[in-house]
Amino acid sequence: MSDFESALSKYPETPLERELLGAAMLYSSGPTGRPKGIVRPLPEQSPEEPLPVIGFLSGLWRYREDMIYLSPAPLYHSAPQAAVGLTLRMGGTVVIMERFDPADYLRFVEEYQVSHSQLVP
């Protein structure tokens, strides 16, 4: 049994009575320059229900189950974090670069047959 399975076995298998969808905790340095978690209200829906924004963004960016998203940016930023989360929610594959390097980026696009990515000019 793996460590994950062992840890998981300590919790009940029955679902929570009223399980709600979670939300990402984003951080801002604000005026102090110190990280501060931005607490947002949780959506009043179950994890099985898609958020309305999912349909909009998946149509806009053509996210789909067979997509491969390459993330060259740090995941503490809201844009790459949102793109990675949406890719996973749609059933796609995510490739994350440890740090951006133009040559590595182009190599990854070819090696992983990347269909989606997000770059800053």
Predicted features along the sequence, with ranges:
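Residue-level signal for pocket-adjacent positions within structured domains
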Residues: 2-3, 8-11, 33, 58, ...
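Conserved adenylation A10 loop of the ANL superfamily
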Residues: 25-40
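A structure-centric signal for secondary-structure junctions around beta-strands
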Residues: 22, 34-35, 66, 91
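Beta->alpha turn/N-cap motifs
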Residues: 120-121
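ANL superfamily adenylate-forming
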Residues: 1-25, 42-54
